[in-house]
């Protein structure tokens, strides 16, 4: 179900009367109207109010309420001159258990945003959002190829996550999106170019590691994603970015340490420091190849002092 843009979700402190630039993100937001090319670089926020995939995956529900809280956390951050134009396309809600229908609806919205010249930034919701974001990218590519003699483009999927999310069990859930993507790539005879940063060796079964190897997944364990290893990880990331035409970035907040992100279904005992994730996200954004991004698994009912929301807002801010 589509939920229209609501400007009441974007509010914050006003410092009118103070000297200098006192703008905040909420001052920059405009409704998405389907025509952005004249405005240049534009990020378009889309909410995905779903935790049906989390429920199916036997996790703790509550992520369906995340989009509103993530907007709230982002709204009060300071605006900057280099910030892209920011629009909001409203939400897609899954409130009747029809996850597949909600994913198809979100894919259509993402395709519309891409066709307008915008760059979608999706606020989940469970990580089932990843299948929908990917489908939106594919749908847009199919429409481009139908309209012009477009050449196939190499898509790099970057996932910051403690888990592979390569479960093969169906129906689809928050743990299956990248297996679904792998199957779709095989059917379309295109490479499955998937890298996962922050994998926990204690959060994935041996069979998942075998399946990842079989699919050619590249990954870095959480123990190899600490601050001292950041320069090496950035070098590896640069090589991957050089090889890609387009990038889809997805962030599961359970990649962060539990102290930083308690508000997730499966908090991480170790996790990847926020500084490391943030620096790598900056590098992806700076590549000029980012086409879509999403932030998943925030559960407001489990958060403490809005720590997780604030961490998510920092990451979202780096993507603007």
Curated annotation (Swiss-Prot):
Catalytic activity: N-formimidoyl-L-glutamate + H2O = formamide + L-glutamate
Cofactor: Mn(2+)
Gene3D superfamilies the UniProt entry points to: Ureohydrolase domain (3.40.800.10)
UniProt xrefs under InterPro entries: HutG, Ureohydrolase, Ureohydrolase_dom_sf, Ureohydrolase_Mn_BS
Protein residues bound to Mn(2+) 2: 161, 163, 252, 254
Keyword Metal-binding: yes
Family annotation (PROSITE patterns): ARGINASE_1, ARGINASE_2
Enzyme Commission number(s): 3.5.3.8
Domain of life: Bacteria
Pathway(s) per entry: Amino-acid degradation; L-histidine degradation into L-glutamate; L-glutamate from N-formimidoyl-L-glutamate (hydrolase route): step 1/1
Alphabetized UniProt keyword annotations: Histidine metabolism, Hydrolase, Manganese, Metal-binding
A GO BP entry: putrescine biosynthetic process from arginine, via agmatine
One protein family per Pfam: Arginase
CDD domains assigned: Formimidoylglutamase
Positions of the UniProt region annotated as Disordered: 1-22
Molecular function, one GO term: agmatinase activity
Binding-site residues for Mn(2+) 1, renumbered to this chain: 127, 161, 165, 252
Record text on cofactor binding: Binds 2 manganese ions per subunit.
NCBIfam families xref list: hutG
Protein family membership: Belongs to the arginase family.
HAMAP family with a match to the protein in the record: Formimidoylglutam
Functional note: Catalyzes the conversion of N-formimidoyl-L-glutamate to L-glutamate and formamide.
Record protein name field: Formimidoylglutamase
